[in-house]
């Protein structure tokens, strides 16, 4: 997490289980860099069993820290969802297969909700009945081994702003038996 006025850390979770999974992660990171975000750190790539909907291929997951000082959070969300769509993401089955998934996990110490102010033309795949399109920190961050393991690798002392526990503490306390293993160590 950053503390100066020259940067703002945003942690992004990436996941893929369709096609060339490694290439999908690499392409997503290159596209994120193409938005002008500086990728500060990237975790190893983890192979993880599906959560929720099990009849699908295993995922590759990774977490990156990016400097998003010049981005409003909803504009960043929209840009990330455009990357997902351009890479072929379709939202058909909740927790189902995907070419790429990019979740905003944390935005420095920000805690709050953002509501939908976009029209259907802006992003027709989003249909949130509650009107809430983004909650920070991610509401299931502390419940998912496939997110916490790579996040702890790059930021073990990062504090969850609501739970007031470090990523390492959250991972140690996690009651999630899902299989998460390093697929490719970071270089």
What is each of the regions a protein language model found here?
Residues 2-12, 18-99, 107-113:
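Nucleotide and nucleotide-moiety/phosphate-recognizing core
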Residues 51-58, 74-78, 82-187:
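Flexible, gly/pro- and Lys/Arg-enriched active-site loops
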């Amino acid at each position: 997490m950053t503390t100066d006025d020259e940067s703002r850390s945003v942690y992004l979770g990436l996941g893929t289980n369709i096609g060339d999974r490694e290439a999908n992660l690499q392409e997503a990171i290159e596209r994120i860099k193409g938005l002008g975000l500086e990728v500060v750190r990237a975790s190893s790539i983890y192979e993880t069993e599906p959560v929720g909907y099990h009849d699908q291929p295993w995922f590759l997951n990774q977490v990156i820290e990016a400097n998003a000082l010049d981005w409003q959070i909803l504009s960043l969300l929209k840009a990330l969802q455009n990357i997902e769509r351009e890479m072929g993401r379709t939202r058909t089955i909740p927790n189902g297969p995907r070419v790429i998934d990019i979740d905003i996990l944390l935005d420095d110490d920000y805690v709050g909700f953002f509501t939908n102010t976009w029209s259907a033309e802006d992003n027709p795949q989003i249909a949130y009945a509650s009107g809430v399109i983004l909650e920070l920190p991610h509401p299931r961050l502390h419940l998912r081994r496939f997110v916490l393991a790579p996040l702890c690798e790059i930021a073990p002392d990062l504090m969850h702003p609501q739970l007031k526990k470090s990523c390492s503490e959250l991972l140690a306390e996690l009651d999630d038996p899902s299989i998460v293993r390093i697929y490719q160590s970071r270089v």
